[in-house]
Amino acid sequence: MVKVYAPASSANMSVGFDVLGAAVTPVDGALLGDVVTVEAAETFSLNNLGRFADKLPSEPRENIVYQCWERFCQELGKQIPVAMTLEKNMPIGSGLGSSACSVVAALMAMNEHCGKPLNDTRLLALMGELEGRISGSIHYDNVAPCFLGGMQLMIEENDIISQQVPGFDEWLWVLAYPGIKVSTAEARAILPAQYRRQDCIAHGRHLAGFIHACYSRQPELAAKLMKDVIAEPYRERLLPGFRQARQAVAEIGAVASGISGSGPTLFALCDKPDTAQRVADWLGKNYLQNQEGFVHICRLDTAGARVLEN
């Protein structure tokens, strides 16, 4: 039996639309992500468990884990009879890389079960392909950090899909999921087909400056450059209370904030534990909309997807 855990991730990070993402893990030790178990069997089966299992498609072939198994078998050129279990702990359409968690855990578990026939680069390419079936286009800003850990910059040149960017140990990521769903496809459809020249220049300046600040170890500058001129001005209308929440967390002391992925999760970066706790308390009282919502104080998950049992 192989059991693999794949962590939540926060894509875009305001400054890097479709090219930047970070894996995150709660500081209290909770596992924020999906778990997939693979066992040898006579025929294929898939069982769904976990807090958000009831939100999965009722038709098994529409389940992304089934599609991962099917695509992996195709890659190896043979049928692999296994019993798979998906522990769906991540809300769907949350902006926390929910589909990436399932895809990464499923493909990594299959690869481990079969003795690692695929290298990490090929595996990551498959992960991007499968996750793209749900989000509508291939982009690696969730699957890369989820699989490899840390903060990842998408390269997609010279056979390099992504490379790690150094983060800051003092940064605490407060993630508030309000309990409503925003589909990635819907959030992409709301974006303009073309952008003004000054917005393109500002975006390039912010992203280049952010990467420079990370490598030159300037956390204050890095946080100051986490601005989004590409998606947030258009997507915030999909998120009730988002603008007020951003203003409130800034007043409490967050050094940066924005939409996690395509939303509705809000992220707020803090550089002090007491500030992070106050931000989390405010968001828990004011940004959450129902019982499915939650707030976690997180750090970068530098390990990425990992085998829990083998």
UniProtKB/Swiss-Prot annotation:
Binding site for ATP: 91-101
GO CC annotation terms, alphabetical: cytoplasm
Reaction equation(s) it catalyzes: L-homoserine + ATP = O-phospho-L-homoserine + ADP + H(+)
Subcellular location field: Cytoplasm
InterPro entries in the record: GHMP_kinase_C_dom, GHMP_kinase_C_sf, GHMP_kinase_N_dom, GHMP_knse_ATP-bd_CS, Homoserine_kinase, Ribosomal_Su5_D2-typ_SF, Ribsml_uS5_D2-typ_fold_subgr
Pathway membership, UniProt: Amino-acid biosynthesis; L-threonine biosynthesis; L-threonine from L-aspartate: step 4/5
Enzyme class, broadest EC rank: transferase
Keywords per UniProt: Amino-acid biosynthesis, ATP-binding, Cytoplasm, Kinase, Nucleotide-binding, Threonine biosynthesis, Transferase
A molecular function (GO) term: homoserine kinase activity
GO biological process, one term: threonine biosynthetic process
Keyword Ligase part of the UniProt annotation: no
Keyword Ribosomal protein belongs to the record: no
UniProt function note: Catalyzes the ATP-dependent phosphorylation of L-homoserine to L-homoserine phosphate.
UniProt protein name: Homoserine kinase
Native species: Escherichia coli O1:K1 / APEC
Lineage of producing organism: Bacteria, Pseudomonadati, Pseudomonadota, Gammaproteobacteria, Enterobacterales
